[in-house]
Every structure is written in structure tokens, then in C-alpha cells.
From Swiss-Prot:
Disruption phenotype: No visible phenotype when grown under normal conditions. Reduced photosynthetic electron transport efficiency, chloroplast ferric chelate reductase activity and iron content. Seedling lethal when grown in alkaline soil. It is a multi-pass membrane protein. It catalyses: 2 a Fe(II)-siderophore + NAD(+) + H(+) = 2 a Fe(III)-siderophore + NADH. Induction: Up-regulated in shoots by iron deficiency and down-regulated in shoots by copper deficiency. This is Ferric reduction oxidase 7, chloroplastic. It comes from Arabidopsis thaliana (Mouse-ear cress). Ferric chelate reductase involved in iron mobilization from the cytosol into the chloroplast. May participate in the transport of electrons to a Fe(3+) ion via FAD and heme intermediates. Might be involved iron homeostasis in trichomes. NAD(+) binds at G446, P447, Y448, G449. The gene is FRO7. Residues 1-28 form a transit peptide. GO terms for cellular component: chloroplast; chloroplast membrane; plastid. Belongs to the ferric reductase (FRE) family. Residues 337-454 form the FAD-binding FR-type domain. Heme binds at H223, H237, H298, H311.
Amino acid sequence: MDDHETPLLSKDLSSSSSSSSSSSSVVVSSLKWILKVVMSVIFVTWVVFLMMYPGSLGDQILTNWRAISSNTLFGLTGSMFLIFSGPILVIAILASLYLIISGEETVFTKKKITKFPRFRLWTFPVLVDGPFGVVSAAEFLGIMVFSVFFLWAIYAYTLRNLNVLDYFHVLPNNRSIFLLELTGLRFGMIGLLCMVFLFLPISRGSILLRLIDIPFEHATRYHVWLGHITMTFFSLHGLCYVVGWTIQGQLLELLFEWKATGIAVLPGVISLVAGLLMWVTSLHTVRKNYFELFFYTHQLYIVFVVFLALHVGDYLFSIVAGGIFLFILDRFLRFYQSRRTVDVISAKSLPCGTLELVLSKPPNMRYNALSFIFLQVKELSWLQWHPFSVSSSPLDGNHHVAVLIKVLGGWTAKLRDQLSTLYEAENQDQLISPESYPKITTCVEGPYGHESPYHLAYENLVLVAGGIGITPFFAILSDILHRKRDGKDCLPGKVLVVWAIKNSDELSLLSAIDIPSICHFFSKKLNLEIHIYVTRQSEPCLEDGMVHKVVHPSVKTPWTNGCSMSVLVGTGDNIWSGLYLIISTIGFIAMITLVDIFYINKYNITTWWYKGLLFVVCMVASVLIFGGLVVVFWHRWEHKTGEVEANGNDKVDLNGEETHNPSAAELKGLAIEEDVQNYTTIRYGTRPAFREIFESLNGKWGSVDVGVIVCGPATLQTTVAKEIRSHSIWRSANHPLFHFNSHSFDL
């Protein structure tokens, strides 16, 4: 054989492989584009119909639709469900297919970024202060659209009310009462249209939120806004009827009415009372000072939804059923995931009182650096769940995830005491029996967060933190450094960290990340600056030189049982979560159709509230039966996959971290490796002057896109957003364009 044949053959194979890969990429891109177009068309058409519905044209469209579809297999209720709730379920199914095709990880390269900086609707702050907090241009447009819709709906329904008065020739004495009740009816209808969207933002692992890459912690604010609007219209709905019945002198008689055919009043009263209790306890002051009262009262959503179905019947309840069904899907999956006990690999306490827990996770669990989890510690409470940002990067290790917890309230104080007890028991290990050894039994929901690691989309980053808000930025830095070390695609080359703390003892948080050990000679690969502002001290303490030492060394838990976090989460495996959604939806449609054919129609069931109850039962049963079946197989797949990967070649140390074997050159240079403190500037007795900070970057970074991520209190976010807005409006062509991103969690 000629010596040149092998290289030629290799070149042919390489060319063939490249051609096949290119062809596959074109097919994937085409499918994604088609799905995007189809989903966009369905969504726009659906929203336009919802906005037209209060008017006479929308009413005529619905009448024609019912005439066409009510005689089909789905019946009258099915026709309403298809036009109001069907589109959002179809979009969810298409979204699951889109995510499956897209793959697991978004890779940002220089080819994907624009040559010149440009404004983005989601990252340009328009409103920076007020009841809405920091509002981006995209959110402001959404607020405007909803505001126009409400004004239009009130105007359109008022015209229709006047036409109804003329049509029925109501007597002058009863005209005002009739108009009042008719207005109450319209307010209730607007409330139902708002409720179409109400449950979509609070589905933590929602396929829809993942599609548009809005994490749950951001979406909760939309739920809050929609909740206020929905309850306002429902309250006006109830108030109009109460005033009208009071004028008639029939308030108590009609208030407790529960008709078989038509609207059942008493269930509506119960639903409204439950809604009002949730509304009052969700106000910012109550939620901030009495969070547990807010949390437990909010469980009345079950009463609110069930009695709403009894109040309006299946026909009208089908208007809001789509969003509620997606929420039930998410809630059942969360319940199943949270039943598993998760091992605490290690725990330690820092001088500032912050606790670090390292939790076990399976190798196939995917998450991004800006993710968060909900944590329950059964020794402290069986009911309380608390959200915490993840402080570790997915590249830190395949078998663990770490969180930092600041001791602020009663729950975290109890956790600190439990860790202290555990530390003392470890020192007396020989004297304590296994049965009496203190334990920390944790359960976890999540992780949740952005679908794509958007911090990797910027070549230049400014990370602004307040206090414990530095936690997610440890994950970002670790993620970037791991990628730089391993030669993976990683855009960020310049990172400025601005961290404001009250006292210097919080500097010990820096011990949670050891930058030189992650990436040796990191300064050659990453331009990193850390500016720390200690606001309540005018000069350093004597102990500041020892800030990297911890009070208690890492505690290894002796009672681990090999249980890691469950991957049964909406943000988990795309194929399984897609199957869960699709099969549950098909099961629900099949179940409601069979009940309609073989029970409701066969036995001539006409009671509205009973049909509404059957509708809710079918929703829940379809998730439990069909969704539960998928969950069982998903769990078995997780178990088998976990066993295979557990027998892999991953090297994990006692802290759950994968070992990295440095090269000979790295080992040779360890003695002269730079210290991260050389790139850290600490200022005492002052706060960050963000205008000066941003102006200083004008000459250093030039005309580039700069991602600014803020994690901290509302005042910090407002201050940064205000400076970004001002800088962006008056910037010169050769200055950076700053993009505001918030990473603060506020239930």
C-alpha cells in the first residue's frame, strides 16, 4: 500500500464527516425556524382573538366557531376549550419539540455576536423606580399592551351593555340595577381573560418559560402583576352584584344561592373570599415581614380554582383551563421530585455566619451557573421550602452542587445550630452511637434558572453584588475559568466584579471559590478585577488578613445513603419532560371526551357546578394517571442511567469535587502563581459610585456590548439600572453599551 493512501483516505472521511455535519446542521436549523414560525403564528392569532373577544366582532367569531365545532366529538365545552386553552397547549407541545431539537447547551461564539453594540428590549431599563421596580423595554411594551386591552375591554363591554339595555326594554326603576349587575358580569369576564395568563409564570419548570428563556425567579413578578389585576376585576365583579342585591333587598338570599343550572353563587363567594385572602397576604409589606403567613395562605389557590369551576361550570372554566393544566403538570412533577431525600456531602460555616452546603447530584443533571434550588431540611420544618442560588458551576464536578446560605431568620438560625451540633458530634465520634448522631435530612426541588447560560453571551461582564448576592457570581467565575482552562468556547475575556458589603467579616465569602486552583495563571486567560466596598467600616480590622479561614472546617456527614437529587424536574431531560407533557395532554383530552360521551351525554347531566367539578377531576386524574405513568418510566430510566454513570471514570474527592491533574508546566509554575488578591481592591467607608465606574470603562473597553448582572437588594438594582439607562441614552459611538440583567429572587 502506498504511504500516501492513508492520509488521503483520512481526508476523504473528514470531508464526508464535515459534509454530513453541515447537512445535519441545516436540517436542524430549518426545523427550528419552522417551529418558531408556527408557534409565533399560533400565539399572535390567539392573543389577537383574546383582545377582540370583548367586542362584537370577537363575539361573532366565537359564535361562528361554536356553530362549527360544537357538533363534533368535543361538544360545546370542547369548542370553548379548543379556542381559549388549546393554542397554549399546542404551543407548549411544539416548544418541547423545539427544545429537543435544539439540544442540551447553547454555545456562544464570536460569530454569533454583532459587530457593533445594539440595544436589546429585554436588557434596556425603561422604568427604574416605582411600584413595578426595574422594568425593561420589553416588559414596558407588555404592560402597555395589557393596559390598552383593559381600557378597550371596558369600553367594548360598556357599549354592549347599553345595547342590551335597549334590547330588553328594562323599566326605568330597574335600569340602574340591571346595568350594575351586567357590569359586574363583564368585570368577571375580564378577570377570567386575565386568569388565562395567571398560572403560566409560576410553573417553575414550565416549557413555555424555557422556550423564551425567562427563569422562574423573573416570571414571579409577572404573576404578581397579573394577580393584582385579576383580583381587582374579580373584586369589582363581586362588588357590583353585592351592591345590586343590597338595593333589591335580596343580598343574603342570593348570596347563598347554589343553582343547578346556571351560575352557582355560593361557590363564587367562597372562591372570591379565598382569592381576597391570598391577595391581601401577598401585598409587599405582609409578604416581606410575614412570609410564612403569605406562603401558607397562598395554598388556598386550590380552594380558589376548584370553587371557581363550581361557580361558572365547565363551559366558562375551560377558558382558563390551559394555564391551570400546565401548572398542575409542573406541581405534580415537583411533588414527585421533592419526595427524595438528598445527601449532604459536606457542610461548613464561615466567620460571617454564612453556611455552605454541598449536596449530592447525579452526573446527568443539567443546570447553568445562574441556577437556584428550593431546599427543605426536615429536622427544621416539614413545610418550609427556601430558595438559594447555586454557588457552584456545573463544571466544578458531576456529582455535587453547592449553595451558600446567609443566616438571617429563624429557619437559617436553626440550620446553623444544627450544623454546630453536627460539628461537635464529629469531634466526639467515638462517644456517640449511630442512632443518636445528629442528622441533616434535605429535600430539593430544582434546579431552575435560565435555559441558556446568558453570561457567556458577552465578551465583557460587570458583576454587581450586594452582600450574599455574590453567591451566583462565584458560579459564573468558576464556569468561565473552567472553560478557559479546558479550552472550551467561552466569550467572556474581561470581568469586573463590584461587591458592596457592610462589614469586613463578609470577605470570608471569598474562600468559597479558589480561583488559582481552578485555572492556573488565570490572568493570562481572563482579565479579572474585583472591587470590594466595605460600607460600614472606615478602616480594616486586624483580623482582615485571615478572612479566608473558616470557623468550622468542612463537616463530612457519616450517614449518607447514596441518594442524590432527582432529575425528574421540568428543566431536566428534554425528551422525558416533553413526553410527560404530550402524553398527559392527550390523556386529559381523551378522558374529558370519554366522560362527555359515556356519562354526561348518556345520563343527560345538566348541572353546571357538577360538570365543572368533573372537568377539574379529569384535569387532575389525567396528570396522576398518564403523567404518573411517564414519571414511573422516567424514574426507572434515571436509576439505570445513574448506575451506568456511577461506574464511570469520574474522579471525585471527599468534597464532591472532580480532581484536576495539572500539567508539568503548571506544577512547575505553582510557586510563582499570582494570588487573586493582587487583582482585588478593597475600599472602606464608601459605596460604589456606579457613574464613575461605568465612565471608567468607556476608554478601557471601547464600543462593545457589556453585560451587567446585578444581584442584591432592590435599591442596588434601581441605582445600577438608573445609571445604565442614563449612560445608554447619552452614550457616544465609541463607548460601551451596557445591558442590564437582574438575578435577584423575590417571591
